[in-house]
């Protein structure tokens, strides 16, 4: 058994050792938890972000689709060059006019389209109504005709200068003529029947 003086000298040593142990445990726990990384909740990647990355950052909104469904439409204009003749007389210079024919098509499809046009309308693909190209503007032009006898004639003709798209429905194709109701004709009495009736009456009297 140790003397009391040794016990007193061991107490401070035990206290120092206990402090060091606590400090070691605290340091270890702090070091341990410092390396723990909290799990970050993974955000589900939406289809829009994937499409944006694949398409080079382009956004496709619903408004863009709506605009594509309704596009401007215009006529397919044709230029015609012809000579006017009347009997033995023919025009000296050819006549250039505009022919409005064919269907109405979206403007980007039409040839020589530069981003606009006269007489454009909005055309919907879902619409059951049909658009047709018709004459819009005309002007009167004088043209001279040269005859074989050396004389000249001057004529006034109408030339088309602009076309437009006109909407036609099924009712336009149906005939709009109102037929007048014909009253039923009264049965005409023949003269022979009258004569027979008169003869029968005479025989009955006799």
Curated annotation (Swiss-Prot):
GO CC annotations on file: extracellular space
Listed name of the protein: Sclerostin domain-containing protein 1
Subcellular location field: Secreted
Alphabetically ordered keywords of this record: Disulfide bond, Glycoprotein, Secreted, Signal, Wnt signaling pathway
Record organism: Mus musculus (Mouse)
SS bonds (residue pairs): 75-133, 89-147, 100-163, 104-165
Region (Disordered): 42-62, 176-206
Biased composition (Basic residues): 188-206
Main location: secreted
Tissue specificity statement from the Swiss-Prot or TrEMBL entry: Highly expressed in kidney at renal collecting ducts level and weakly in brain.
């Amino acid at each position: 058994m140790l003397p009391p003086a040794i016990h007193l000298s061991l107490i401070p040593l035990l206290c120092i050792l206990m402090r060091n142990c606590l400090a070691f445990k605290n340091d270890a726990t702090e070091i341990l938890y410092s390396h723990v990384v909290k799990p970050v909740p993974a955000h589900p990647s939406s289809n829009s972000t994937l499409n944006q990355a694949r398409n080079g950052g382009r956004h496709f909104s619903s408004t863009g689709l709506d605009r594509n469904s309704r596009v401007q439409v215009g006529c397919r204009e044709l230029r015609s060059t012809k000579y006017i003749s009347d009997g033995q007389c023919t025009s000296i210079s050819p006549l250039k006019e505009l022919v409005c024919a064919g269907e109405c098509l979206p403007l980007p499809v039409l040839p020589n389209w530069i981003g606009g046009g006269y007489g454009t309308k909005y055309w919907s693909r879902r619409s059951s109504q049909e658009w047709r190209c018709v004459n819009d503007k005309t002007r009167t032009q004088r043209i001279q005709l040269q005859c074989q006898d050396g004389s000249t004639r001057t004529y006034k003709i109408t030339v088309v200068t602009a076309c437009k798209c006109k909407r036609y429905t099924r009712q336009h194709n149906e005939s709009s003529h109102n037929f007048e109701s014909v009253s039923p004709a009264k049965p005409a009495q023949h003269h022979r029947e009258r004569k027979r009736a008169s003869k029968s009456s005479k025989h009955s009297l006799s």
